[in-house]
């Protein structure tokens, strides 16, 4: 998939809805239709800059206080007590689901072409959130073919689902075999400086009955606890609310991904 492919082209391409419903959901959640049809691309969504309520303001607004890290200063107003690191949030809607699905990206420069896992595109450094060198650009996204018994789902919490940036988002991938979970990934978006992979998800879910709500609840709580260490006051919504909602969004994504994996009819749910 070329990085310059328009979001609307992805939504209108039937195989995406049938084979990668989680990706369809994420792309559908990006911006208003005017953005999807005229200016929005999948590469642009993956490479967008991090956001923060203190940085994304006019020069007049920012002139009223000390310059923050992202603007070239030496403090972060989003972090309680200040910080020498920028704690802006990665707001890409497509990144969590694509990382959960083990997507790779092709990076090109004048002299070199390289392929790497999508998660390696993100530096988790708020001032410079991408690992791209100045002479490099993202040219392709490679999405694996969905294997039998696998399902993926995307969830987003926002005031207005498509128009607003996410308060919290989640991409989940689950592969089942013989009624049990074989593989699983969960990636939380909009809470940290880069997409946040929950390391314990596969260990917790592997070999458990597919759809085991106790196991899914354990992962959801672990996701919330993990996010709590990274989440900052970089949005207008309270940190406490966003932190608690991580578990809710994670549970929804994992539950629907598992249902799709078991039913193999996930494309019917992507509307």
Where are these regions (language model features)?
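C-terminal structural segment of proteins
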Residues: 1-271
């Amino acid at each position: 998939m070329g990085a310059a492919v328009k979001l609307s082209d992805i939504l209108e391409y039937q195989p995406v809805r049938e084979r990668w419903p989680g990706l369809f959901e994420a792309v559908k959640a990006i911006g208003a239709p005017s953005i999807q049809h005229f200016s929005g691309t999948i590469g642009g969504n993956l490479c967008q800059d991090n956001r923060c309520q203190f940085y994304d303001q006019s020069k007049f607004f920012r002139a009223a206080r000390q310059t923050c890290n992202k603007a070239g200063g030496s403090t972060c107003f989003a972090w309680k007590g200040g910080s020498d690191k920028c704690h802006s949030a990665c707001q890409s809607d497509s990144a969590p689901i694509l990382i959960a699905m083990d997507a790779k990206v092709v990076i090109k420069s004048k002299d070199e072409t390289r392929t790497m896992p999508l998660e390696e595109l993100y530096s988790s450094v708020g001032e410079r959130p991408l690992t791209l060198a100045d002479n490099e650009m993202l040219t392709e996204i490679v999405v694996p073919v969905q294997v039998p018994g696998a399902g993926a789902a995307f969830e987003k919490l926002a005031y207005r689902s498509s128009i607003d940036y996410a308060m919290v988002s989640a991409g989940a991938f689950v592969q089942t075999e013989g009624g049990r979970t074989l593989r699983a990934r969960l990636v939380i978006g909009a809470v940290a400086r880069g997409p946040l992979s929950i390391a314990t998800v596969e260990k917790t879910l592997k070999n458990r009955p597919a759809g085991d709500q106790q196991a899914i609840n354990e992962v959801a709580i672990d996701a919330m606890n993990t996010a709590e260490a990274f989440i900052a006051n970089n949005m207008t919504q309270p940190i406490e609310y966003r932190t608690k909602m991580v578990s809710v969004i994670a549970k929804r994504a994992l539950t629907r991904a598992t249902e799709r994996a078991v039913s193999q009819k996930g494309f019917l749910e992507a509307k």
